[in-house]
Swiss-Prot record:
Name of the protein this chain belongs to: DNA-directed RNA polymerase subunit beta'
Entry GO CC: DNA-directed RNA polymerase complex
Known partners and oligomeric status: The RNAP catalytic core consists of 2 alpha, 1 beta, 1 beta' and 1 omega subunit. When a sigma factor is associated with the core the holoenzyme is formed, which can initiate transcription.
Lineage: Bacteria, Bacillati, Actinomycetota, Actinomycetes, Mycobacteriales
Top EC group: transferase
E.C. numbers: 2.7.7.6
Pfam families: RNA_pol_Rpb1_1, RNA_pol_Rpb1_2, RNA_pol_Rpb1_3, RNA_pol_Rpb1_4, RNA_pol_Rpb1_5
Length: 1318
């Protein structure tokens, strides 16, 4: 067998009949499968042991040879080789066909490759192949030319004889008629009898004339057909062909069926044809040129590689190994078999019948019919249903052919090669484990015992609890007491992987150290729920066990949950306190006025109250009941760093641990600060979720991951502890309906009645009435909401939960306690009748049904969205899977300019809202210099929060940063252009699969995006596509719905306003030709933008526009942007447009992820003129190849090729990849494979997918070459310690048959018995 680690590329091509016979171990001659009595394979049948190998290890068919010692002997009685049964998975057979057949992929695919090669229309090809027409295969032009005059003379003679015969017959008939009439006249017959006889005679004469004329026409047709007879000409008329063969058989040869195609190909001169086509392309125009280009692609493919076009017509059909199309006995004695066996059986039956007919010398028509049936049966075997009705099995189910085995989600590629089921795994329901550390999980004892069984058994033997593995296994199965102690020992520090489906991003699988727990549920740390998107309402998770040392190391270092605190999408922590923990911390840091023991100034009779010398003293007061943790106190702190302002005032040299200072705060906040690292400045404020998130962000930016993990763990414990003590509960009595509600409703009811009256009178139309009512009731809802918020007391748990940011928002509270307000119908429009009740008061029946209307749409939407979003992720992964960090720095000077702040009129800077996702975590491409020329941050520096703050302080508004879009690395990207990895906060490692991370980061929030198209301000009209459909539209580079024109040039606008359309003319500044945009629908509205004077208003007549500026509302067409503004601008445009959608949903994704995808969309160039290069005009080429070829040609002094960048959608870009394995496993499998085989494509195995498919280590992460070839050199001491045992190259291990003398045991049956000792 091949070892995948030893080859670097995989080529696919056409197999010739020779190849097929060489692969084969024998010919399958009979359609039989197995003998139903003995259940043994039939000889020469589809399961024959002689051809495919024995069904039992080391045992021949007749049983003469049994045992391993006869290895390799071929039994003289039954002809079966004695070997392992698994060869039945790899040995192929073949069927020798009695007549050639064409391969359906090459004839029926679009475009038809056979048709392009032979220049025949697919319709004509079909007629030839399926015996409906003859085709001329060869014409002896010379012979025909030499003897043409003789043949013409013969033809003239024949024609003359026909004409003479006709004239003679007519003469005779006319005389007979005259005689008849004369006779009748003599008898005195009536005139009508005479007329009848005359008519009869004339009719016969006319028939004679017609018959002769038909004969002459036929001779003419035969003659003209013969004189113009050319190769590849079709003759559909059977009789005409027969005549031609009879008369001029020696001048030409014709045939039908696949044989004729084979003959045409034998005489086909590829080089000459390619030359002609190139000539046509150079001189031709229009359709002719296009057709020639398409044909040249196919012809050139056969010209350049060692493929022969003969491979498209088969003389032999390979039979795949029987284990891959098995036959299994069911318990009823019946057999279940793979569909392929039925399809092969049909081929063999028809082939055998055809052989017999040919031997018998059957008439041609019968033989042809049998050949046609053979062709159809081979077609069904290769691709059932591609042509005509599919062959069906029992129950009218179409049989699965070889192509169907590869296609689709259930096909070989996606089901078995790209994802497999694994052993050492289990799954169970998850429950919360609040006592766990961040890197731990609770594993049920029984599950752990089953997963670690082999480890436990080995350890039991090592510790002499069991004599051998068998008894150890028995101990484990009976769960003896010793087993549990051993299990504890075995699982220590052996991480396990937990996975929750759907795994939408890489944090869906994380490693944990298992802790044994009772029960049968897995315990999960509460802080990792966010990453897994898990909750404890019955979710299940799968556990996997990393076995090898390498796997354990990767799990521990790369996948441990405490090393995966940051989100790979935004670089912000995901392991945040949430829900109860937030409430607890919020409660802890609250400051209550007038609480027990609060700070009070000294009076004449009382000393100062609420002043403590240390947190411990304050804690004692709490224990005594003299103080509550929310009360304001003064306390002296020595172990916590003061806030920055106090530190600069009290400790100008900087604070040192142990320096005392007094804080006016609450004990709760002191306790909170004790959870943070000691040198973190004291935080003296209340802690809602947002504030907690900021602190954890800050920690992640400034402290090592270990500290962050410990801190969030402490926060979790404190959060739960104080949440329990806060007594936050929700009961119906906490839902307080504001008493002002009735009065608010009255005033708005009155307004609504007025609108209704106006409508009744006809003063308003329906749309106006609706929008007026919507406006009134929205205001009413807001009013009620405000009244409700004001009415809730501070200590009410419901607003407390919302204000702390733990869960919910005020809109939901408003539905509970105020009023539900307006709801939408499934179209997304507001229903003008509001829901006036709150849920506490209860809805009326009508309100209930109006409310469920929108809710039901929401659920249907979510279901559709999940599927759509999953498919988007799949396409994104496919297009970006080979983007891997390949080098540290590509050395480019280029970059993109990003804005970090906006300068206001008064000179102040306002930080840009999107710094987090655009500039943050990148590398500077040029020194950031302030107005005085001082370098604030140097080129090559990483922009974290501190660096960005420094830039803002220096008054810098824009910086030039490195970007994936400008990276010059050949395949993949370089680390410097990518910047820091969002998930680790450090510069990205070499080998990181950033393409997949990007795809996951964009795809994962896909389910949160909306499906619907928004109606703008209640105006019916062109909807603006938003949400997920908009993201798909952008990534697929489709022309958007409601496309907006962009200015082709800079210049002044002339705006003409028609009834239904605008007409915009741009007069260019450079005096070029005017650009006119006609028929712009008024429903689209003009675009608002900033003008030179700084005001924002609609585009108007006489305005000045810049090149690329959008003129109307709507979305610009990315292809237009590419044409007008060039590739860099279109990339930035796409990134911004995708970000628009995600930001509108509040999803934070870093630009670099979208850039990775967009870069893949613009990787190709369309060749316009090939110059002196090998490229075909009109073909798509990788930009890198294009530039390399041009450099080479220019260096040799030739003409470089001209090309223009082309924007491809992600589906198209995935299918256009250089790797045929990756493309075939993505979509349109048969089309990709057909194309790859003709072009003899070679897959360089650069991306991840192709390596996963062939089972090689993927070239990313630790599998990248520069890490794989590392050699560990032990130091002298290590060597001395390790090699105290005898070395392996002394006389103990003589290298005889054991391969490399590694001293490893060799399985007995692999040991060559060459030096036999019997």
């Amino acid at each position: 067998m091949l070892d995948v680690n030893f080859f670097d590329e995989l080529r696919i091509g056409l197999a010739s009949a020779e190849d097929i016979r060489n692969w084969s171990y024998g010919e399958v001659k009979k359609p039989e499968t197995i003998n139903y009595r003995t259940l043994k394979p039939e000889k020469d049948g589809l399961f024959c042991e002689k051809i495919f190998g024995p069904t039992r290890d080391w045992e021949c068919y007749c049983g003469k040879y049994k045992r391993v010692r006869f290895k390799g002997i071929i039994c003289e009685r039954c002809g079966v080789e004695v070997t392992r049964a698994k060869v039945r998975r790899e040995r192929m057979g073949h069927i020798e066909l009695a007549a050639p057949v064409t391969h359906i992929w090459y004839f029926k695919g679009v475009p038809s490759r056979l048709g392009y090669l032979l220049d025949l229309a697919p319709k004509d090809l079909e007629k030839i192949i399926y015996f409906a027409a003859y085709v001329i295969v060869g014409v002896d032009e010379e012979l025909r030319h030499n003897e043409l005059s003789t043949l013409e003379a013969e033809m003239q003679v024949e024609k003359k004889s026909v004409a003479d015969q006709r004239d003679a017959d007519l003469e005779a008939r006319a005389q007979k008629l005259e005689a008849d009439i004369a006779e009748l006249e003599a008898e005195g017959a009536k005139s009508d009898v005479r007329r009848k006889v005359k008519d009869g005679g004339e009719r016969e004469m006319r028939q004679l004339r017609d018959r002769a004329q038909r004969e002459l026409d036929r001779l003419d047709e035969i003659w003209t057909t013969f004189t113009k007879l050319s190769v590849k000409q079709l003759i559909v008329d059977e009789l005409l062909y027969r005549e031609l063969v009879d008369r001029y058989g020696e001048y030409f040869t014709g045939a039908m069926g696949a044989e004729s195609i084979q003959k045409l190909m034998e005489n086909f001169d590829i080089d000459a044809e390619a030359e002609n086509l190139r000539e046509t392309i150079r001189s031709g125009k229009g359709q002719k040129k296009l057709r020639a280009l398409k044909r040249l692609k196919v012809v050139a493919a056969f010209q350049t590689n060692q493929n022969s076009p003969m491979g498209m017509v088969l003389n032999a059909v390979p039979v795949i190994p029987p284990e891959l199309r098995p036959m299994v006995q069911l318990d009823g004695g019946r057999f279940a078999t793979s569909d392929l066996n039925d399809l092969y059986r049909r081929v063999i039956n028809r082939n055998n019948r055809l052989k017999r007919l040919i031997d018998l010398g059957a008439p041609e028509i019968i033989v042809n019919n049998e050949k046609r049936m053979l062709q159809e049966s081979v077609d069904a075997l290769f691709d059932n249903g591609r042509r005509g009705r599919p062959v069906t099995g029992p129950g009218n189910r179409p049989l699965k052919s070889l192509s169907d085995l590869l296609k689709g989600k259930q096909g070989r590629f996606r089901q078995n090669l790209l994802g497999k089921r694994v052993d050492y795994s289990g799954r169970s329901v998850i429950v919360v484990g609040p006592q766990l550390k961040l890197h731990q999980c609770g594993l049920p004892k029984l599950m752990a015992l089953e997963l670690f069984k082999p480890f436990v058994m080995k350890r039991l033997v090592d510790l002499n609890h069991a004599q051998n593995i068998k008894s150890a296994k028995r101990m484990v199965e009976r769960q003896r007491a010793q087993v549990w102690d051993v299990l504890e020992e075995v699982i220590a520090e052996h991480p396990v992987l937990l996975n929750r489906a759907p795994t939408l991003h890489r944090l869906g699988i994380q490693a944990f150290e298992p802790q044994l727990v009772e029960g049968k549920a897995i315990q999960l740390h509460p802080l990792v729920c966010e990453a897994f998107n898990a909750d404890f309402d019955g979710d299940q998770m799968a556990v996997h066990l990393p076995l090898s040392a390498e796997a354990q190391a990767e799990a521990r270092i790369l996948m441990l949950s405490s090393n995966n605190i940051l989100s790979p999408a935004s670089g912000r922590p995901l392991a945040m306190p949430r829900l109860d923990m937030v409430t607890g911390l919020y409660h802890l840091t609250r400051l209550d006025e007038g609480a027990i023991g609060e700070l009070a100034a000294s009076t004449s009779d009382e000393a100062e109250q609420g002043v403590y010398s240390s947190p411990a003293e304050a804690q004692m007061a709490v224990d005594r009941g003299a103080l509550v943790v929310q009360a304001k106190i003064k306390v002296r702190l020595t172990q916590q760093r003061p806030p920055r302002d106090i530190e600069s005032e009290l400790f100008p040299e900087g604070w040192n641990y142990g320096d005392g200072w007094t804080a006016e705060t609450t004990l709760g906040r002191v306790l909170f600060n004790e959870l943070l690292p000691a040198d973190y400045p004291f935080v003296n404020e209340q802690m809602p979720k947002k504030r907690q998130a900021t602190i954890i962000n800050d920690l992640a930016e400034r402290y090592p991951m270990i500290v962050v993990a410990q801190t969030v763990d402490k926060l979790k414990d404190a959060g739960f502890y104080w949440a329990t003590r806060s007594g936050v509960t929700v009961s119906i009595s906490d839902v307080l309906v504001p008493p002002e509600k009735a009065q608010i409703m009255e005033s708005f009811e009155a307004q609504a009645d007025q609108i209704e009256k106006k409508y009744q009178r006809g003063a308003l139309n329906k749309t106006e009435r609706n929008s007026a009512l919507v406006k009134i009731w929205s205001e009413a809802t807001d009013e009620v909401g405000k009244a409700m918020e004001a009415h809730f007391p501070d200590d009410n748990p419901i607003p407390m939960i919302v204000k702390s940011g733990a869960a919910g928002n005020m809109t939901q509270v408003r539905s509970l306690a105020g009023m539900k307000g307006l709801v939408t119908n499934p179209k997304g429009e507001f229903i003008p009748r509001p829901i006036k009740s709150s849920f506490k008061e209860g809805l009326t029946v009508l309100e209930y049904f109006i409310n469920t209307h929108g809710a039901r749409k929401g659920l249907a939407d979510t279901a559709l969205r999940t599927a759509d979003s999953g498919y988007l992720t799949r396409r994104l992964v496919d297009v970006s899977q080979d983007v891997i960090v390949r080098e540290v720095d590509c050395g480019t000077e280029r970059g993109i300019v990003t804005t970090i702040a906006e300068k206001q009129a008064d000179g102040t800077l306002i930080r840009d809202a999107h710094v987090e996702t655009s500039t943050y975590a990148r590398t500077l491409a040029a020194d950031a210099v302030d107005e005085n020329g001082n370098v604030i941050v140097e080129r090559g520096h990483d922009l974290g929060d501190p660096a960005i703050d420094a830039l803002l302080e220096a008054g810098i508004t824009q910086v030039k940063v490195r970007s994936v879009l400008t990276c010059t690395t050949g395949t993949g990207v370089c680390a410097t252009c990518y910047g820091r990895s969002m998930a680790t906060g450090k510069l990205v490692d070499i080998g990181e699969a950033v393409g997949i991370v990007a795809a996951q980061s964009i795809g994962e929030p896909g389910t949160q995006l909306t499906m619907r198209t928004f109606h703008q301000g209640g105006v019916a009209g062109d909807d603006i596509t938003g949400g997920l459909p908009r993201v798909q539209e952008l990534f697929e580079a489709r022309v958007p719905k409601g496309k907006a024109p962009i200015a082709d040039v800079s210049g002044r606008v002339q705006l003409e306003d028609g009834d239904r359309f605008y007409k915009i003319t741009i007069v260019p500044d450079d005096g070029g030709e005017e650009v006119v945009y006609d028929k712009l629908s008024k429903r689209q509205r003009l675009r608002v933008f900033k003008h030179d004077d700084g005001t924002e208003r609609l585009l108007a007549d006489g305005d000045h526009v810049e090149v690329g500026q959008q003129l109307m509302e709507g979305a610009a067409d990315p292809h237009e942007v590419l044409r007008v503004m060039g590739p860099r601008q279109v990339q930035i445009h796409l990134v911004n447009e995708v970000q628009e959608v995600y930001r509108s949903q509040g999803v934070s994704i870093h630009d670099k992820h979208i850039e990775v995808i967009v870069r893949q969309m613009l990787r190709r160039v369309t060749i316009i003129d090939s110059g002196a290069t090998e490229f075909l005009p009109g073909s798509l080429t990788e930009r890198a190849d294009f530039e390399a070829a041009n450099r080479r040609v220019v260096a040799e002094g030739g003409e470089p090729a001209a090309g223009r960048p082309v924007l491809m959608g992600i589906t198209k870009a995935s299918l256009a990849t250089d790797s045929w394995l990756s493309a075939a496993s993505f979509q349109e499998t048969t089309r990709v494979l057909t194309d790859a085989a003709i072009n003899c494509r070679s897959d360089k195995l650069i991306g991840l997918k192709e390596n996963v498919i062939i089972g090689k280590l993927i070239p990313a992460g630790t599998g990248i070459n520069r890490y794989r070839n590392i050699q560990v050199q032990p130091t002298e001491e290590a060597r001395a310690a390790a090699y105290a045992v005898p070395s392996y190259d002394d006389q103990y291990y003589s290298p005889d048959g054991f391969g490399q003398n590694t001293g490893a045991a060799v399985p007995l049956d692999d040991y060559g018995f060459s030096n036999d000792y019997r």
